[in-house]
Amino acid sequence: MELVLLDEETLYEYIFERYVELEANANDLSQDLGILSRNESELEIDIGPHRLVTRKKKAPERDEYTFSIHQNLTSLNSNRDNNNSTTGYVIWTTSTFILKWLLYNDNATIFTRGGVKDEVDITSIFQCQQDDKLRYVLELGTGTSPMFPIVFSNYVDKYVATDQKDILPRLKDNIQENQSECRRRLLKSNTIALDDLKRRTELECQIDIALLDWELFSGSKKSRNDPVLQCGPNFHLTIIAMDVIYNEYLIVPFLTTLESLFVWYTEQRVTVSALIGIQLRTQDVLEMFLEEAIIERQFIVHAVDEKELNKSRFILLHVNLP
């Protein structure tokens, strides 16, 4: 695996090569838009490692998860719900693929546990022995999926899932329904009614949902003053966003919000990094996104060049501000 620094020249080479790979693997990949199921409102989703039957030494045990998720297909096809922004009402394959990759691909430990790769110093997403800071994950455009919030709450001290107003009640319901899949920590919340589940640990995760509208956040003191978003300098924050860039109109609001979050938290002496997962659809949209992020806004972007990712229709970007 390599971390490829994208700049105003290499970003075009990267995009070209990635779409060549996509075309080469086309026969093995689904050609739909990436919705996990267009037919079912109630989904049962298993998150676990891919098992190969071999004679080699038994692989180490990894935590596995089973989710019961309600998605709203009616709202997806509505022209009235959530001001026409309806993609968050259903579950997308980007989330399941990237989540499994982060949990079960050995190359992903550079992100979950931290370290140095290709001269890039990466702070871990999960709480570990890398440093004495607490771990906070802020997810942008969570949708109604509880998978990242619940799985990551096993390993971090604070998790905030954000989206638009009409999405949040359904997200809350799905988190409540699947809270038992957090087995390594006690869940606490100021925004979600949780059961008093017993765990053999004193470790806790503060899990919350919050309204974060990309059109409003950068100039809104009200959004920034939400106590759910607050944290102290003893935290490292990882901002994650999965499959939120699928048309050109989202690029500027998303990057403006991301930039504002980096600046805002840095001013509070919180260290910040970001991971962005994207499904490869229209090449022009990806090109416009990277141009805006790298050339116009000076984000430091590294693309994850890794075998399993390269055979898929997904990319993963590690992002920082200088």
Curated annotation (Swiss-Prot):
GO biological process, one term: methylation
Molecular function in Gene Ontology: S-adenosylmethionine-dependent methyltransferase activity
Annotated positions binding S-adenosyl-L-methionine: W92, G141, T142, G143, D163, W214, M242
Enzymatic class: transferase
GO cellular component term of the entry, any: protein-containing complex
EC number(s) given by UniProt: 2.1.1.-
Top-level lineage group: Eukaryota
One Pfam match: Methyltransf_16
Keywords for this protein: Methyltransferase, S-adenosyl-L-methionine, Transferase
Function: S-adenosyl-L-methionine-dependent protein-lysine N-methyltransferase that methylates 60S ribosomal protein L1.
Family: Belongs to the class I-like SAM-binding methyltransferase superfamily. RKM5 family.
Protein name: Ribosomal lysine N-methyltransferase 5
Gene name of the encoded protein: RKM5
